Amino acid sequence: YIKVSKFARNTYNEFITAIAKLKQAGCTSFVIDLRGNTGGYMDAAINMINEFMPEGRLIVYTEGKSFPRSDVYANGTGTCKDAPIVVLTDEISASASEIFSGAIQDNDRGTIIGRRTYGKGLVQTQMSLSDGSEMRLTIARYYTPSGRCIQKKYEMGNTDAYDQDIYNRYMHGEFDSADSIKMDDSLKYQTVGGRTVYGGGGIMPDIFIPRDTSGVTSYYSNVVNSGVLYLYALEYSDRHREKLGSFKTWEELYNYLQQQPLLSDFVNFAATKGIKRRPTLINISGKLIENQLQAY
C-alpha cells in the first residue's frame, strides 16, 4: 500500500524507494491511494505510470485547437510491469491523479476503486506581459489513452455551474450510490482489452465505493437538517470574502481551508444557534463536517 498525497518534485523518487522496500518485504501487488490527491507535477505522475507499463503503451496525450497532438509512451524500463495494481480515487482526486488512474484503466493494467474523480485536465502556458504581470493561457487538454477528455464540461460564461459541480454531484447522491452516476452513452470508449469506459470528465471507477458514512451522528444530522451548516458557510464566506476571492485555483482554496480551524469555529457558531455541544459525537463527525463546509 502506497499513499500519494501530492505529486511533488520528489514524489517519484520517494515512490521508487517505497516500491523497493515493499518488494524487499515480499510484496508482489500494489494498492496506490490517490484519494484527496489534487495533482501536482505531471512528470512525477508519468514516471510513476511508466513503472507499471510495458514498452510502447500510450500513457497520455495532449491536444488543442491550435496545439498539435503530443503523445507520451512508456519506455519499458519500469520495475512493476507485471505486478497487479489497484488505484483508489475519490471526487478530490484531480489532474495528475486522473492521468495516472486513466492510464492504468485504459491499458487494463489495474482496477480503479472509489468514486468519479474531479475532472481537471487542462494544459496551460504562462505568458509574461509588459507591465510585469503574467497570464496563464489554456492551450490544450489532457486525454487518456482511449481518447477520453479528462477535463469536465464547461459552458462559456457559466462559471457558477462549473464551480458548484462537486456540490451538485453530492446533492444528486453520486457519492452515495452508483445508480446516481450519469453515464453518457455517446461518450463510450474502449480500453486496450476491449472493456467499455465512459468519458464526460473525470475517471469513472471500475468498482464504486460510496463515501464513508460512519461519521454520521445525531449531532451531524442536527446541524445539517437545521440548516446551520449551510448558514455558517454563508456567513464564513461573507466574513472572508476578500481572502477567499484572492485564490486563483480551487487547489489553492482547498489547501488554505485545510489549514483553517473550521470545525472549532463552526461548533462555536452552532452553539449560538441552539445546537448543543456534543464532544464525543463531534469527534466522530468532525471530518465529515469539515468536508461539508469546504464543499459549500
Name these PLM-found stretches.
Residues 23, 36-37, 73-75, 111, ...:
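Generic detector of intrinsically disordered, low-complexity, polar/charged segments
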Residues 96, 108, 115, 119-187:
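Polar, glycine-rich mid-to-C-terminal structural blocks
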